[in-house]
Amino acid sequence: MYFYFFNKYNLKILEKKLLIIFKYNISFKILHELLYLGYEYSFLYNYSLNIKDFSNFIYLLILYKNKINNIYNNKYYEIKNNYINVFLNNYYYLKVINKIQGILNNNLYNKINPIYSNLFLFFNNKIKIKYSQLQQLIGYKGYISNIKGMIYEKPVINNYINELNIYEYILSCYGSKKGIIDTALKTADSGYLTKRLINITSNFIIKELNCKSPFILKYILNMDIYGNIILPLNILRFKILQNNILNLNNGTFIYTKNTYITKYILNKLLNLYNRRNIYLNIKSVYLCNIYNNICNTCLNYKQLYKYNLGQHIGVISSEAISEPSTQMVLRTFHASSILKDKFNFNKYLIYKIYLYKLNINKIFKLIINFKKYINIKFNLIFLMNKILYNYNNILFEYKYILQNQYIKCNFIYNSISKNFKYNLNNIIIKYLNNVIKYYNYSNIQLLIKNIHNKWILYNIYTYYLYYYHIKFYNLYNKGIILNNNNNKYNVIYFLINYFNLFSNYYYKIYNNNYNFINSNYYFKMNFILKNFNNIQILNKLFYVNNIFIYYKYEKKLFIYLNIINNIIIKKYLNFYKYTYNKLFFIKKYNNFLYLYEIFKYNWYKYLLLNNKYNLYIIYNNYIKYLYKYNININLYFIKNLFYNNNNFIHNHIIYKNNYYIYNNNMNLYQYNKNILINNNLLYNKLFYNYINNNIYNLYLNDITIGLQSINIIFENKNIKDNIFFISNNIYVIFYIKYYNYLNNIIYIYNICNKYNINHYKYKLNFYSYIFEDISSILYSGYSLHTEFYSINKNLKYYFRFLLKSINIYQATKSSYIYVYNILIESILKQYSYQNIYLPSIYFELIIKKMLSCIKIISNNFKIFKYNDIISLQLINIINYSLNLNKHYIYKYEPIILGITKSILANSGFLTNISFQNTFKIISLNILNNKIDWLIDIKSKIILTDLLPVGNGWYRYLVN
């Protein structure tokens, strides 16, 4: 079944098509029929629901997260049965609505409740309501919270008609006071936001036709996190194309230069066969050469006239941005009865862990809920460095080691990479001759770069576009394959082939000669070879990476055979051996020889070409964060990337930073990060039943939308979070504070006692799909204030990376461009989730101001002091002059300024002392001379000067 999503632009296209194809009378009848359908729908039900109404409800996003982008990117959208049952033609949903409507139509509601309520008022008068309003109306009423958000135990039962008692009257005052104060404060915040936006953009007046800037931004089609091939619609819409697009099939031009980019054009480009070779060149406001202003060409936006000369585009954009924010204040529903979390009186099994460590004053105490994990097919548990499984009530343990190194020649810092979905059908476990073998079929994964230069990990077999780049190797070779043959694509392939994860082989040979051919990889091999004198190896049948090991009781030799140079290297036991980027070591236990192969992926140069950044966390198939620690020597630790699934996390992360070894324990404690890492911890586990019968741990929640996250992005606010580690051997705790709807969450991934057959797993109450949007610092209207994605750290690290190869100005400008698109998309999404669509040019003007200054980090100069905030173009001119005269130049670093700080940095002295922090500004400038050029709008108002407002420039309009 196909559905067409209409907006104003689509309706205009429909009218034109109808008039071209049909006559006026037929077109009139079709449009009139559509009008009747709309009226019939509006009178049939009181609900005005759209699929976009669910974008702000985090727990419904999982139902259509893989399909929602197709609504905006494709002309038609096929809704499958599982999605159509949820949103559009849900039989049970319509059945409930029909029952409610039938009760109202038959006047049964008056018999049930003769006192009119708000719900009856909405239904009886056919007032359109949204889902959030309906949620407020049908929720349990009467529970009141105090100023701290705690709910009182007794609700308000009566109303003003039936009279309130003194207890209920006092409680009702809380809600009245809260509604009045919230409305007043948020309206004031919205008005103050308008004032700040106009102050920051007041100087943007189009005075130049063309600045002759040679720089453009190139956009290509890429894969988003949902697997869709997309173009950045929000950024490209309302822009002007700067290049010709050629159809490679027939050699004709699809679109030519100076074409106005619309959604229809982007959809047509997405449907082309050779779309992967298409580049869209767009002029950018940030790349304009004019100091503290923009030209008409770089504005790249057509309004009413051919030229925008004289247009006060800064004030227009600020008003266009801030006016919807005022409307968002009116969308705050003071829902006294909407509970933030569900509560019940069921019994929960609580798992307490008390950790104690000698010589460390820090004691971790954590309480989590957990559920028992049961695998029906095979009782398998994936741990950090071993696999535990239960077979015939016997616990087996198998070890494997994978070394963590650096991804070669790539930058994926702070990206969130998505792995393929875990499928148990790909796992085969065979029991043959009391030998347990664990198999996994061939999997090919890749890292691709998306629009914002971020790496995304995907399974090749599910997305057809990248079949062109698959480079199949021998089935027995595995590792990272980097394809640099085509510079247009930055693609890394993880080729993981058919292999045996663990296996026990017991060879008993009694003849003198033995021919041994092995072409598989094993994480663990046990070889017992007895009574032999000669060993014959068939070199022709061996592959490059094959190994041959034998064990001799008398001399205890470990022999590694390399077929490349046909040299047999002999080493004693328990020695590490490097040969062609492969590391092996063996271990003797109970007359068995255990061979461990440490797979090296050559992940050096992976982050900023610096070995200081060595640690990253993979949890729920996402590369989340990288920590910066100095590593002086190599420390081999256990790592498994093969079997990351949604149920378990099994990456053993150990890094070295002034560690010491005592009683075979490696201990690490960082006081500033509150990180405690131990190999063998002394911990006590207590189990008890906890009855959740306390209503005081619940909080009431308002339905607030929009304005808070907009303020946070514009002001560049940061919320610092504590991040810990907990696992079986290394404890990882994530303590994450979210801005709006989630306060304190503790994630504990794996809880397992290897001496106990019962293994437990904590089921997350906040799933990982919240973090899927890797190109934005907010998701579904909520800001992500975690250290997983800190835009300021991202800017700083990228600047340091670029500084190694280019000069300081180029590194600063490039790093600003790097975060430019992220900030634009973040703020555009905040408005689009509220069904407010504005041209991106309005936001680009503000973000250009936010990214226009730097911070001085030099100490030996007199003009500018340390931590002074100066314009980037100004300091570049000064450094150029200093360099010509062979003087030391200023050292600086990029900084993202909020709109308030940007106003203070770009305004004169009079504006600053009348804006904010008057006493601080006067005290800082009391000993220094300060020159005010009186060029900002507030200085002109103070001095009653003429304001640069009006469309002027009449000669350009006439010509």
Curated annotation (Swiss-Prot):
Chain residues that bind Zn(2+): 211, 288, 295, 298
**EC number in record:** 2.7.7.6
Main subcellular location of this protein, as a coarse class:
plastid
Name of the protein this chain belongs to: DNA-directed RNA polymerase subunit beta''
**What cellular-component terms does GO give this entry?**
apicoplast; DNA-directed RNA polymerase complex; mitochondrion
GO MF assignments: DNA binding; DNA-directed RNA polymerase activity; metal ion binding
What does this protein's UniProt record list under function? Answer: DNA-dependent RNA polymerase catalyzes the transcription of DNA into RNA using the four ribonucleoside triphosphates as substrates.
Question: What organism does this protein naturally occur in?
Answer: Plasmodium falciparum (isolate 3D7)
Q: Where are the transmembrane segments?
A: none
* Listed cofactors: Zn(2+)
Q: Which reaction does it catalyse?
A: RNA(n) + a ribonucleoside 5'-triphosphate = RNA(n+1) + diphosphate
Q: Name one Pfam family in it.
A: RNA_pol_Rpb1_5
| Compartments (UniProt record) | Plastid, Apicoplast
Q: Which family does it belong to?
A: Belongs to the RNA polymerase beta' chain family. RpoC2 subfamily.
